[in-house]
Structures are given as C-alpha cells and as structure tokens.
Curated annotation (Swiss-Prot):
Gene3D superfamilies: Dihydrodipicolinate Reductase, domain 2, NAD(P)-binding Rossmann-like Domain. Kidney. Belongs to the Gfo/Idh/MocA family. The record marks 180 as: May play an important role in catalytic activity. It comes from Macaca fascicularis (Crab-eating macaque). This is Trans-1,2-dihydrobenzene-1,2-diol dehydrogenase.
Length: 334
C-alpha cells in the first residue's frame, strides 16, 4: 500500500524531496498534497510536481484525512510549529534537520509525538546512504579494532545565501552544517552522551556562528572532533580510527557515495537523479523516504537508525556549543 505524503512548505529542499518521491514506485509512495503559507505558491508547486491538492495554510494540510505522513521542509525556526500542528492532527512526521533551533524545541516535539503515539523522525538523510550503512557494518564487525577517535569537517562559503547568515532565522554553521558532523561522531560512538565538550569559534558579523571547532570527550577515553564553517572551504570528509585501521567517508561526507576502509576504496552509486535537483546527491533522499515507509508499515513510532533520544542529544550538544561561543537566537529561552 502506498504511503501518502503531504509536503509542508515549498522551498528548495521540499522540491527535491518531492521530486525524489516521484521517482519511487507509485505503489509505495504518493504525494497527495502540498501546503504553503501562500496559496499561489502552493498551486505553482503542485502544478510543477503534479500534486492533486494545494493548500494555502499548513493547518489545511494537517487536517486532510488523505495525508498519512507530513514532510516538514520549512526553515529551522518554523519546524516546531509545523511539526506540532501535524502531530495534533494525528499525522506521522518526517522533519528536516535540525529538528529544532534548540533542545527545548526538540523535547517539546518528542514529548508530543510520544504522548500521541505518533511516528516522528529527524531527516538526517546521511545515515541512510549505502556508504553510511556500510560504515556501520564495518564498525559492528570490529574491523577497525578498538576505536580511538572520530573526525569530521564540513565547511563552504555560504555568505551569499541570505538564510545562512540570518540571525533571526537561526543561521550559522552549527545548525546547517555542524549537525552533519555531530551526527557522524554520535553514530560512530553509538549515541553516547559526551562527558566533556570543548569549543573554539568565531562569530560572523551578523551574530551567527561563523567557524567552529569542537572536541567531544566520550566514555572510555575516546574522542571526536569536528570543524564547521560558513566562510571557509573545508575537506568535507569524515573519518573514524581504531587500533587496526581507519575508515573514511569522502567528500561530500553529508551525502556520501565513497567509503575507504583500511585503504580499500568502495563506491556506492546513487539512484537516477530527478531533473533539476537543487542539492548535491539529492537522489539520496530516497533512502530516508523508504526507511520512513518501512517504519510506518511495521508500526514503529520512531526510527531505530536515528531514534528520538539521539535527536535530543544532538540538539543538546549543538546548543551547548553555541552557548560556549556566545551565540543565542531569538528562539532560545533565557
């Protein structure tokens, strides 16, 4: 039976996700509705993607009985309101990362989903790429020996993107790029809570975080470190090292297709790319979409690959890092 999707917001990421859904078998995935805060934009999006219903408010989509799961692709500060609206209407939700601007927002969404017995997942698409799955297998098999350190970098000059430097929209490196680094390190170390976090960073002239380096100390004297930046080009790779060798996800590590394990290079081809994708390796969104369908058809309320407790942990870490360099957003409760 097809999973019936409703798309909340009509931005670039929503366009890519919708295009990818429509490359999948219609017997498994169908986009039945789209909503924007402007009906004309929703209708334009619906026409472009051949979606039967267009709504001029998120409330209308949430109330549509034909929508089974909502994909929330709004900008960061609008995530919580849209997610809460959809959950209140009884919908399962896949919410773009970061799920919330801060940990309090994430906990509020998680509490709501659990109290209503509804599925909620943060769309950390990286974890569902075959290269990431292969890395998890390598770690599970102990191929690298006793783990010692994980390292990730994600940086590019995004100062030409208004949202990336917009303080009011919770811009900056950490929430846009750093979350990919943190989730990698967390995945490597099994979702453990770090014992200590050390931070160095600089703020952008607009008040958002510009370039940040973080050291995470974990139980068992292992550690992870990452650097993220919206002004500097970095290697955009992620690696984990142990007593028997190293594994590395090559650039682009946030949507990886290449994995090197102890010098052995493996490439994982992506599905065909839909026309006019806005983001690198956009076709890889199909993996998370398939995972959501599998979870819902099994009756699961959260993903075993990115459980809600880990979404809460990632939010805790990112918030602590932000506060350490003096970056707070309007959404933060003081």
């Amino acid at each position: 039976m097809a999973l019936r999707w409703g798309i909340v917001s009509v931005g670039l990421i929503s366009s890519d996700f919708t295009a990818v859904l429509q490359t999948l078998p219609r017997s498994e995935h169908q986009v039945v509705a789209v909503a924007a805060r402007d009906l004309s934009r929703a209708k334009e999006f619906a026409q472009k993607h051949d979606i039967p219903k267009a709504y001029g408010s998120y409330e209308e989509l949430a109330k549509d009985p034909n929508v089974e799961v909502a994909y929330v692709g709004t900008q960061h500060p609008q995530h919580k309101a849209a997610v809460m609206l959809c959950l209140a209407a009884g919908k399962a939700v896949l919410c773009e990362k970061p799920m919330g601007v801060n940990a309090a927002e994430v906990r509020e969404m998680v509490t709501e989903a659990r109290s209503r017995g509804l599925f909620l997942m943060e769309a950390i698409w990286t974890r569902f790429f075959p290269a990431s799955e292969a890395l998890r297998s390598v770690l599970a098999q102990g191929t690298l020996g006793d783990l010692r350190v994980a390292r990730a970098e994600f940086g590019k000059n995004l100062t030409h993107v208004p949202r990336a430097v917009d303080w009011a929209q919770a811009g900056g490196a950490l929430l846009d790029l750093g979350i990919y680094c943190v989730q990698f390190i967390s995945m490597v170390f099994g979702g453990q809570k770090p014992e200590k976090i050390s931070v160095m960073g600089r703020r952008h002239e607009t008040g958002v975080d510009d370039t940040v380096t973080v050291l995470l100390q974990y139980p068992g004297e292992v550690h992870g470190s990452f650097t993220c930046s919206i002004t500097a080009q970095l290697s955009n790779t992620a690696s984990v090292s142990g007593t028997k060798g190293m594994a590395q996800l090559l650039n682009p590590c946030w949507c990886p297709t290449e994995l090197v394990v102890k010098g052995e290079h493996k490439e994982f081809l992506l599905p065909p790319v839909p026309k006019n994708c806005n983001f690198d390796n956009g076709a890889g969104m199909s993996y998370e979409a398939k995972h959501v369908r599998e979870c819902l058809r099994k009756g699961l309320k959260e993903s075993p690959v990115i459980p809600l407790v880990e979404s809460e942990l990632l939010a805790d870490i990112l918030e602590e890092v932000r506060r350490a360099i003096g970056v707070t957003f309007p959404q933060d409760k003081h």
